[in-house]
Amino acid sequence: MSLIRGLISTIYYLPKIYKWFYRPYYFLSLLMTLAFVIVRCCPGLCEHLPSQREDGDSCAFDWREVEIFMFLGAIVMMKNRRAVTVEQHIGNIFLFSKVANVVLFFRVDLRFGLLYLTLCVVFLITCKPPAYMGPENIKYFRDSTIDEELQRDSRVTWIVEFYANWSPECQSFAPIFADLSLKYTCLGLKFGKVDIGHYGAVAERYKVNPSPLCKQLPSLLMLQAGRELMRRPLVDKKGRAVSWNFTEDNIIRDFNLNEIFQKYKKFSKGEKPEEPQPVLEEESESPLEEEEEDSESKKDK
């Protein structure tokens, strides 16, 4: 099922994926992924490679190499079951294909393995995935502005993402969060981001651990008047994040975005905001108090 879903998703986003390979990162990643296949099947190169096939054909895959490719496919399918975006699907394919290429090149020749491993290290250091540059309606906070901005208006609900640029999960989640900000931003609901890789003090104040071992990045916090109402993912007693998929549907459901948006939607049309909810609750309780006073007065009589 996961293989079929991934295949359908790839076909659906094929025009978008096609444009990615104009970018150096994705183009070079594709070459690194197909490196062993190119070397093994390219005339003029494959004739000089050793082979363990019975017929001695060095331009064809032996059975052990086929097994490694099959194992690679199984690992990619397992990892892509939790992938949310197309970027995550493609990233998993690139990552585990490079690992498989390292094993395959070392089987052929130690020198080829060391050369490919060196290329992978250089690529990892010099090439970074392109950051999301699409439309969004997000306010970026700094250490000195986040507390003041969150407490400025107690009627505004903030959905704040705590992220780090080095985190692949945060990079994959960026287009999802941007799309949500475009759909749900209104006068009473706003979206913000803070880079805890640069502002570690903010992470400490809001109890978000940036360590990769804790897997708390990205973290989404719902805040109102500077007070935390909800967060995802949740954190257990050991400080590790409880598994939670950062899909658009999960965020809309768990944070009640539809209800909050409908509540504040009329504010964006220029209507005067209503009184805060606590005042309305007090007004709704006042008739009950009057009834109790009337009953007590009747008893006294």
From Swiss-Prot:
UniProt keyword annotation of Mitochondrion present: yes
Subunit details: Monomer. Homodimer; disulfide-linked. Occurs in both reduced and oxidized monomeric form. Oxidative conditions increase homodimerization.
Primary site of residence: endoplasmic reticulum
A biological-process GO annotation: brain development
Position of sequence motif Di-lysine motif: 298-301
UniProt-annotated stretches for the region Disordered: 268-301
UniProt function note: Endoplasmic reticulum and mitochondria-associated protein that probably functions as a regulator of cellular redox state and thereby regulates protein post-translational modification, protein folding and mitochondrial activity.
Regions crossing the membrane: 112-132
Keywords: Disulfide bond, Endoplasmic reticulum, Membrane, Mitochondrion, Signal, Transmembrane, Transmembrane helix
Localisation: Endoplasmic reticulum membrane; Mitochondrion membrane
Annotated PANTHER family: THIOREDOXIN-RELATED, THIOREDOXIN-RELATED TRANSMEMBRANE PROTEIN 2
Domain Thioredoxin: 122-269
Pfam families with a match to the protein in the record: Thioredoxin
Cleaved signal peptide residues: 1-19
One cellular component (GO) term of this entry: mitochondrial membrane
InterPro entries associated with the record: Thioredoxin-like_sf, Thioredoxin_domain, TMX2, TMX2_thioredoxin_dom
Ranges of biased composition (kind: Acidic residues): 280-295
Comment text on domains: The thioredoxin domain lacks the 2 redox-active cysteines, suggesting that it lacks thioredoxin activity. The di-lysine motif confers endoplasmic reticulum localization for type I membrane proteins.
Regions of this protein lying in the Extracellular compartment: 20-111
Membrane topology according to the record: Single-pass type I membrane protein
Organism: Danio rerio
Protein name in the entry: Thioredoxin-related transmembrane protein 2-A
